């Protein structure tokens, strides 16, 4: 009985992969050019592809066996009070952190931002983490992950180096077109060098000052020009590669972590988003937040909850995409409350630590947010369907007259951006889908797998991240799919795709001997390398052809001698444009 059952799983999973690849080929003619497409109307081909994608998800979900050897959920730890009244180092650190936070908040509310306010803000999270020292070695309360191996870390180091090389290559030439929003960030950040302002909301784009200060720090370290602005962003984007590996390893195993990191490394979308400053920090912060939170749940150790709280508190201080954490955390908490209530009641002190860490990291921004809530919310009300202008624009754009019809179009364009619809943002505007064909096909299967295992908190976390990002960054916003808004979903996407890839690998490798598995691994590496090379060539070629006149003029002027006089004589160009100023 066992052997036929395995073959049924294998046939079903491979059939699902074939359906996903066929659907992708119908939509974009990759990886296979189908002559059939030329005989079909575009709408017919799209509907057929949508049906095939849905069938692939369903078939893979049915073919996927229950996860083998799934670790049991951790038993709630015995209560170990941290807030004891005794004079201990943890109690003293917590008291100092709380007093420092209150003092900093009071100083800010009474006199505004100052060096003392910033020092107290920084001291709070550091003192809080210090309360967990010295770390006592306690065994994890669940089955631990496999022990580390040298090749695992060697592969991760190799991928991280490759990711940096791809993202730093031709750093000031790619992207070819520099959108005005990016140069505004550079101009505003340049003004903050020597005059730091970490608290509040910048009036130009209504982004947090903290976000601009990160760019100012980058330019102070690496140069007060486009190179200095971009390099800091590239370093943050590169750091997301090992962060995704860690999260994938925590949620599943090293194979999922490595494959997810590889898929993100070769992604042209992540390559671009890592360069253009605005979305890079949210990707790293949310990935680390989820990794710390899950490690805390898995091990029952409070320090990971504290770190998750600190990252959660930092999430509203960068670009808006990071605020998806404010959806992920409550929904996961609610899931635990319904299905694993003991993980709430038995670890309530750890959950309080998460809240306290978030409060400390958010710091004096709490005072600003309470005083100027509308400014803190930024452009939320201007770019969503709640804005009547946006609503009317979308009705006219789609030629519909009702909200349900509008939402159907919004959902289609958002959900299918991984397979078909191109970016609408001025910062990228890449003329193709968000994912390459390999990642897109694996994502389809990974979603089916995760939905079939939705009772598993790991799947629930990824599906929540995925769905919340698409709803908040696409369905409810103006002119989706805007990849600057939707980019926050990429870590969840590659982990979902990697889970499907590893499941397929397990089915194919099961009957093979050691040499057969090595050959299969070599084929996987070759496939990833081939897709990665094609992704880079496609991205670099597009970048050369995407340059707009304003950027071409600014690049030309920047290469002239410093004493050269330049006169602009034709609209719509003006020296007041940030592209020329920066």
Task: Briefly describe each language-model feature range.
Residues 272, 321-325, 503, 507, ...:
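Catalytic lumenal/periplasmic loop and adjoining terminal transmembrane helix
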Residues 166, 174, 183-199, 207, ...:
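Transmembrane-lumen/periplasm boundary regions of multi-pass, lipid-linked membrane glycan transferases
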Residues 244-266, 456-464, 517-524:
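Transmembrane-helix signature of polytopic, membrane-embedded enzymes
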Residues 273-274, 324, 437-442, 459-509:
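Hydrophobic/aromatic-rich transmembrane helices and adjacent perimembrane loops
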Residues 231-251, 288, 444-448, 499:
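Transmembrane-helix motifs of polytopic, lipid-linked glycan transferases
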Residues 1-153, 307, 328-335, 351:
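Membrane-embedded, hydrophobic transmembrane alpha-helices
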Residues 269-281:
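Short acidic/glycine- and proline-prone juxtamembrane loop motifs at membrane-interface regions
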Residues 106, 287-305, 312-315:
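Membrane-interface transmembrane helices that cradle and orient dolichyl/undecaprenyl
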